Amino acid sequence: MVNHPCIVQVRDVQPDKIEIVRNMALKRNAEVEKAKNGLDIYFEDVNEARKFISKLRKSMKLRIKMSTKYAGLRGSRVRVLFVYSLRGL
């Protein structure tokens, strides 16, 4: 079962800005994990993740890609995992 229907992957961002991104995510009650070239941020609400991405875009230049993956069924509803990939320019 998917606990977090949305993952935001932040990659290739300047090291000094990584801490700012981390603090912004923690303020929105997201789980943050360190990844090889950045951060993986897990959101329980897709709309909250979209608001977070919108705030980030205002403060730094990013290239954004979005993908979806099938995550199973809950009752008769299809669950979808949203993955947003953000890369610094």
From Swiss-Prot:
InterPro entries: Nmd3_N. This is Uncharacterized protein AF_0860. It comes from Archaeoglobus fulgidus (strain ATCC 49558 / DSM 4304 / JCM 9628 / NBRC 100126 / VC-16). The lineage of its organism: Archaea, Methanobacteriati, Methanobacteriota, Archaeoglobi, Archaeoglobales.
